[in-house]
Regions:
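Active-site region of PLP-dependent enzymes
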Residues: 74-134
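PLP-dependent aminotransferase-like
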Residues: 1-73
Length: 134
């Protein structure tokens, strides 16, 4: 069972039931369970070792999958497959992630401007330059 605590901790906090799986020496999951309705297979792409062709095979077998490409930032997502990426493992940022999905969000999100937290860096990008003269 080789996964980041942040995954299991979040599932526990959100009261999401989960099972873990082992991996083989090629970092492929050892998982032969049939998924029930409403269950998802969380496929961790360790070190980018699983190709998109292999991901398509998992998608065909399990239908509902989420691909964790946190360690494969530069691997394109498989079309129609929910895929997560992290920024902080590859770039000098404290946090941040990207979700690729074709699902539609049925709620309105608040618009956030980052310049109040990063005025010296982003202010001139998001507003006029004159607002940030010292």
């Amino acid at each position: 069972k080789f996964n980041c605590d942040c995954i299991t901790d979040l599932c526990k906090r959100m009261n999401i039931d989960f099972d873990t799986y082992s991996i083989d020496k090629s970092f492929r999951p050892i998982f032969n369970k049939e998924l029930n309705a409403g269950e998802w297979f969380y496929l961790i792409n360790y070190y980018g070792q699983i190709s998109n062709t292999e991901i398509e095979v998992y998608k065909g077998k399990y239908k509902n999958i989420i691909v964790d490409n946190a360690q494969a930032y530069f691997q394109m997502p498989v079309e129609g497959t929910d895929t997560l990426y992290t920024c902080r493992k590859f770039f000098g940022v404290s946090d941040g992630a990207i979700l690729y999905t074709d699902k539609k969000l049925n709620r309105k999100l608040d618009i956030d401007e980052s310049f109040n937290r990063m005025r010296f860096v982003l202010g001139r990008f998001e507003r006029s330059a004159s607002e940030f003269y010292i």
